[in-house]
């Protein structure tokens, strides 16, 4: 099977063109291929497929084989793949995901996509839609117990369920210990992606990410979007900010007039290969 390794701000996935390739068991393939010692290495597997309702369909599997609704970094890479590899000549695309149809605008220079802007949709703050095991209109600035310590957290769905909390120094955290405890907390029936956020100033956030099903990643597009949405709603930053991640920087903007979030960032090829499953 032919595949392509791509990354967006260091959030790397294995991409398969399912117009020409077939993956019989994507979940098992994701587990095997994502292994950084015995496989290709990546945060998961992305299948680029035909769609009856959009230009293309993106199917995502986390490194543990579980399905994912949406990934902001991966969808930018899909946009670059289909344009640079000649599957389309459009610079405005629609991509079907489990979180709905997303619109992409491709920034092309010298025949290749450099950056991609994505409409991430509206932030969903209702607990039952995130989902969070709590009543009320929102789940913002609420205390939860994690490994015997009280954390103040806020939740939102920006394509995936997210939990946002604020820290002074994200890099000082014991991620292998607290990451799984947050992800699998009883408040999150579908598990959650966790963003540990430092507010640098009104237009700059620094974020460290623990992703559901993949562990710590260098970047998360839906997570960066969630961090901006929660932080702006709480009045801790403006409606537009650069989100600095371990693997790079994403620009997130919230158009309150239409209640739509936009993410802009890079996408890059790493290498092509062939593997026997």
Features from the language model and the residues they span:
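Glycine-centered secondary-structure boundary/capping sites
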Residues: 86, 129-131, 143, 235-236
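Short, charged/polar, Gly/Pro-enriched secondary-structure boundary elements
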Residues: 124-128
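N-terminal, positively charged, Ser/Thr/Ala/Gly-biased leader segments
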Residues: 1-22, 118, 130, 135-136, ...
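Membrane helix-loop-helix hairpins that form the core translocation module of multi-pass transporters
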Residues: 115-117, 121-123
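A glycine-rich beta-to-alpha transition motif near the start of alpha/beta enzyme domains, typified by
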Residues: 1-112, 163-277
């Amino acid at each position: 099977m032919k595949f392509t390794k791509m990354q967006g701000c260091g959030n790397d996935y294995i991409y398969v063109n399912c117009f020409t390739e077939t993956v019989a068991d994507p979940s098992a393939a994701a587990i095997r291929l994502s292994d950084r010692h015995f496989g290709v290495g990546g945060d998961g597997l992305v299948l680029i497929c035909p769609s009856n309702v959009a230009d293309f369909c993106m199917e995502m599997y986390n490194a543990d084989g579980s399905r994912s609704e949406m990934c902001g970094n991966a969808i930018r890479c899909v946009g670059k793949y289909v344009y640079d590899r000649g599957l389309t000549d459009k610079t405005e695309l629609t991509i079907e995901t489990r979180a709905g149809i997303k619109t992409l605008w491709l920034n092309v220079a010298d025949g290749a996509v450099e950056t991609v802007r994505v409409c991430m949709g509206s932030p969903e703050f209702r607990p039952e839609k995130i989902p969070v095991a709590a009543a009320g209109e929102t789940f913002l600035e609420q205390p939860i117990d994690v490994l015997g310590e009280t954390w103040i957290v806020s939740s939102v769905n920006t394509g995936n369920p997210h939990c946002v909390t604020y820290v002074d120094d994200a890099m000082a955290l014991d991620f292998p210990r607290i990451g799984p405890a947050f992800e699998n907390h009883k408040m999150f029936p579908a598990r959650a992606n966790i963003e540990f956020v430092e507010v640098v100033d009104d237009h700059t956030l620094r974020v460290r990410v623990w992703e559901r099903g993949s562990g710590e990643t260098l970047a998360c597009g839906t997570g960066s979007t969630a961090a901006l949405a929660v932080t702006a709603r709480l009045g801790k930053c403006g409606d537009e900010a650069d989100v600095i991640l371990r693997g790079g920087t994403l620009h997130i903007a919230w158009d309150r007039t239409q209640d739509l979030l936009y993410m802009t960032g890079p996408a890059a090829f790493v290498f092509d290969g062939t593997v026997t499953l």
